[in-house]
A protein has these predicted regions:
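N-terminal signal-anchor transmembrane helix
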Residues: 235-282, 286, 291-294, 448-454
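Catalytic core of membrane glycerolipid acyltransferases/transacylases, capturing the structured
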Residues: 107-112, 118-124, 234-235, 258, ...
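Metal-dependent phosphoesterase signature
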Residues: 42-77, 254-255
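Membrane-interfacial amphipathic helices and adjacent loop/beta segments
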Residues: 55, 241-268, 298-347
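Active-site neighborhood of HAD-like aspartate-dependent phosphohydrolases
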Residues: 1-35
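A hydrophobic membrane-anchoring feature enriched in long, contiguous, low-charge segments
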Residues: 24-27, 214-236, 251, 258, ...
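C-terminal cap/substrate-recognition subdomain and adjoining C-terminal extension
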Residues: 61, 68-230, 239, 474, ...
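Non-catalytic C-terminal accessory region of glycerolipid acyltransferases
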Residues: 335-514
């Protein structure tokens, strides 16, 4: 959904790499290309000149950052389903794109696609020369790239599916045996009807409708309403705990209904068999708070970033519900702030809900775990219950402004005994617990050494302590609610896909072997 080139251009402007005159020249070139008076290779050359002398390694690192920040959320969940459907049939998959590899490869890596064909920029001695490698992967060049792929797989284009939304790809659509027009332009849809090509339309990304926005605002407001409705219970019973439990359950039911969120839960019995417990969940989405409220329901405390405390209405309500706000940029202060949670676990018999990653992951890949929750488990002696959330990223990916209605699949795993844990063995236990998540998510497990290396090499934009420092340094900045507000409740259509003949053109395969 959308164009990765836009994210790159906006980033270059924001970083001061393009002057107003440069932007004007690029805009003029894009306009001429759109009108057909400038060829694709010439259009690419206009942009490539601005990279001359720049180290490729820096551009690669920046492209990966941009993917995490702005592009990952654009990948259609239906596209992921489609890719898996092709894999299940034993098909080989490639991305064949006119974009540069720096736009395409991060998405390919996230999707598990090794074969990438794109328009290359010339690099000598690790630096861009400002020239484009010919031929570019456009028009007949894209056909040539697809033929290279099929030859390597000992197949032919006649066996291939190819998915596209643009008439720019008409040459390859005509060359393959199974052309599919996906979210096609009006002109391409007309051509598809004339030639009896398969068509499909994905709807789970894009602009929210008025109805979706209204329902989302209502769901967000239901948090306030749910706690207000709990006040009469508190007045009558005098029990703050019963009032909060009532409000949490009411919020979970109301907001889920408004959003259209359903949960498919395996191992639900583990939510209740060993309380109090520390419920650890992998953090993918703004929807996770609602999901955990729906699952755990009562007698809970939580941990949230300090920035949430100052949010109007939401912050005070979260504090009243037992959320402890921590300063992610100050490890010592964070540990001190969390000490009362041991009392809540041991004396008040409340359970702790915590995301060991410390921040939302931009993709489905499990991030590095922080040790705070594990220290809490060791000090309190309560078990850890892993809650594996499979696809809340589909419902509302990091950085998105809306929620999508649909079904989230959750595995609640058996409790893990922590009574014999020690400081000396803690890293081993962290690795073991993280590997239980990885197994459930069908991702490769890591050794202790590999787990430590992952923590060390986690990019700064995925480290909550670094993000916290950034927020402290810029206290007056305007907050991007889609990045910082886990209370946003927006929704969109249910994801349904049963056929391996659907795909999308941004971050998804464009050629597959049948």
């Amino acid at each position: 959904s959308g164009y990765s080139a836009s994210a790159f251009l906006k980033d270059q402007i924001a970083r001061g790499e393009l002057s107003p005159a440069d932007v004007a020249q690029l805009t003029q070139a894009a306009t001429r290309f759109g009108l057909g008076s400038l060829g694709f290779s010439a259009f690419m050359a206009v942009h490539a000149q601005y990279l001359a002398g720049r180290p490729e390694a820096d551009y690669i690192a920046n492209s990966e950052r941009l993917f995490r920040r702005a592009i990952a959320r654009l990948i259609y969940p239906e596209a992921r389903q489609l890719i898996e459907a092709h894999r299940a049939k034993g098909h080989s998959i490639a991305i064949v794109s006119s974009a540069t590899p720096y736009q395409v490869r991060p998405a390919a890596k996230d999707l598990g696609i090794d074969d990438v064909y794109s328009s290359e920029l010339e690099v000598i001695d690790g630096q861009f020369t400002g020239r484009v490698v010919q031929p570019t992967c456009f028009g007949d060049g894209k056909v040539l790239a697809a033929e290279t792929f099929t030859e390597a797989k000992e197949s032919t284009l006649a066996d291939c599916f190819f998915y596209s939304d643009s008439t720019d790809d008409i040459e390859l659509l005509e060359a393959v045996g199974h052309p599919v027009v996906l979210n096609g332009s009006r002109q391409l849809r007309v051509i598809a009807r004339e030639r009896s090509w398969a068509t499909a339309h994905f709807t789970s990304r894009g602009n929210a409708s008025g109805s979706q926005i209204f329902r989302s605002l209502a769901a967000t407001g239901s948090l306030v309403g749910s706690f207000l409705l709990g006040l009469p219970l508190y007045a009558l019973s005098g029990s703050r705990r019963d009032s909060i439990n009532f409000s949490i359950s009411l919020f979970a039911e109301t907001a889920s209904a408004l959003i259209g969120l359903d949960l498919d839960v395996r191992g639900r019995e583990h939510l209740w068999n060993h309380r109090p417990a520390i419920f650890m969940f992998n953090h993918q989405s703004n929807a996770d708070m609602l999901i955990m409220a729906s699952l755990v329901r009562r007698d809970i405390v939580g941990v949230g970033k300090r920035e949430l405390k100052n949010m109007p209405f939401i912050g005070p309500l979260m504090g009243a519900a037992g959320v402890v706000f921590i300063d992610r940029s100050d490890r010592t202060a964070a540990i001190e702030t969390m000490r009362p949670l041991v009392h809540a676990l041991q004396e008040e018999r409340k359970s702790l809900v915590i995301a060991p990653e410390g921040t939302r992951a931009p993709t489905r890949k499990l991030g590095a775990f922080k040790k705070g929750g594990f220290h809490m488990a060791m000090q309190s002696g309560v078990p850890i219950v892993p809650v594996v959330i499979h696809n809340s990223h589909d419902i509302s990916p990091k950085g998105d402004r809306i929620f999508r209605s649909g079904t989230v699949h959750v595995d609640v795993l058996p409790p893990i005994d922590t009574s014999d844990w020690t400081t000396e063995t803690l890293q081993t236990h962290v690795t073991d617990v993280r590997n239980t998540f990885l197994r459930a998510l069908a991702q490769p497990e890591l050794s202790v050494e590999e787990t430590l290396a992952l923590e060390e090499h986690t990019p700064d934009d995925l480290k909550p302590e670094v993000r916290g420092q950034t927020n402290r340094q810029r206290p007056g900045r305007k907050t991007n609610l889609s990045d910082d507000d886990p209370e946003q409740m927006l929704q969109a259509p249910v994801i349904k896909n049963n056929q391996p003949a659907r795909e999308q053109n941004n971050g998804a395969p464009e050629a597959t072997r049948h």
